[in-house]
Amino acid sequence: MSSAPKLFRVIGGAQNYDWGKLGSTSAVARFAKLNDPENVSIEEEKPYAELWMGTHPSVPTVSAQDRTPLRDLVRAAPEEMLGQDIIDKFGSKEGIPFLFKVLSIRKVLSIQAHPDKALARQLHASDPKHYPDDNHKPEMAVAITDFEAFCGFKPLAEIDALLQKIPEFRELVGDDVVAEFHSGIDSSDVAGKKKLLQKVFSRVMNSPESKFEPLAARLVERTKSDPQLFGETLADLIQRLDAQFPNDIGLFCGCLLLNHCILKSGEAMFLEAKDPHAYISGDIMECMAASDNVIRAGFTPKFKDVEVLVDCLTYSFNPVEEQKLKPAPFPRGTGVAELKLYDPPIDEFSVLQTTFTSAGAEKFEGLDGPSLLIVTEGKGKIKLQGSDEALDASTGNIFFVAPKAAIELVSESKDTFTSYRAFCEA
């Protein structure tokens, strides 16, 4: 007899980092309140940054019925909650291999990258205080409102144009490296071009405050006196981020070196290990491998590991459109809903968006691993196929779905009913 339920509601944990949206402007706060109204009261002056769903011990997700941590339920019945194939593949009976989050961003997050598995093992062994585990941390973001981020380095010709026309950028990098970069970027030697980009980034990141702070102040002034030099979008971006982090190195290493990526609701981007990125504003669903390893560079008062960062990045340089992850169809559901699968090229997770705009049902085959589903808009029902017991599924509600459990989502009106389901399969 199976003891663990195959479908049940859970409650995630909210994080109040300073960069979060304030009070009820935050999707995190609204979802947390709607899912647990008796225990959550929104403080309007307080930032609500992240809502965590998973088995990470830092911020427990608990059963809505009796507040038992999901991690404890998994550890008590790993074969039923994870599936033997997932246990074998990831080598753990302790938890779900991914962490699913809602993020509501008011202020820019630190420019950062995450190590791959080999580097994570090395960093964790040498500096466990700053690198708490030995796992990699690929991430995917799906916008649920208009969202902007830095992601990956700009194409080299764009960086070269900025170095040529913005005196403060040129002075920070140095005429010698600027000239070498300018003459080398048309080469067919990709590895050589990556080395040149690394030189530029290293000069920026290793410049002392006494050098970059006055240059940053001049840079901001130039965006006001000569905005057409930058273009309206970039000038505005530099001014907005300077207001949040005055004279920060991120104005150079973020605004002038990284792609400014703007996503509409439903658009996604995948961030591979060792790619620099930073979220700027908006609300997203984020899914990642279950790790806490971060190598930071700018827009942060926290520990910056410049040497590791400069050494580890891939230095890929691609147009901003190539940073986006296009959704694919999902053939394992039948019914009236629109299904979009966000399936990055890694093992730990995929995310399925299900949207109803009419009354009706969508039936899903059982998946070969655990999943977590959150309703982000509207309301409907969720149930196991063949069961008479349907659970209310409304905005903010989160559900755990066990491996092989075939579920059904039901919309009872023409109002939009949207959910996101993160899952992992062997």
From Swiss-Prot:
Its cofactor is Zn(2+). It comes from the Eukaryota. It is found in: Cytoplasm. Binds 1 zinc ion per subunit. InterPro entries: Man6P_Isoase-1, Mannose-6-P_Isomerase, Pmannose_isomerase-type1_CS, PMI_typeI_C, PMI_typeI_cat, PMI_typeI_hel, RmlC-like_jellyroll, RmlC_Cupin_sf. One of its GO terms (cellular component) is cytosol. One of its GO terms (molecular function) is mannose-6-phosphate isomerase activity. Pfam families: PMI_typeI_C, PMI_typeI_cat, PMI_typeI_hel. The keyword Cytoplasm applies. Disulfide bonds: none annotated. Zn(2+) binds at Q112, H114, E139, H277. Its EC number is 5.3.1.8. The active site is at R296. The keyword Metal-binding applies. Keywords: Cytoplasm, Isomerase, Metal-binding, Zinc. GO terms for biological process: carbohydrate metabolic process; cell wall mannoprotein biosynthetic process; GDP-mannose biosynthetic process; protein glycosylation. Pathway: Nucleotide-sugar biosynthesis; GDP-alpha-D-mannose biosynthesis; alpha-D-mannose 1-phosphate from D-fructose 6-phosphate: step 1/2. Its main location: cytoplasm. It catalyses: D-mannose 6-phosphate = D-fructose 6-phosphate. Belongs to the mannose-6-phosphate isomerase type 1 family. NCBIfam families: manA (TIGR00218). Involved in the synthesis of the GDP-mannose and dolichol-phosphate-mannose required for a number of critical mannosyl transfer reactions. This is Mannose-6-phosphate isomerase. It comes from Ogataea parapolymorpha (strain ATCC 26012 / BCRC 20466 / JCM 22074 / NRRL Y-7560 / DL-1). The lineage of its organism: Eukaryota, Fungi, Dikarya, Ascomycota, Saccharomycotina.
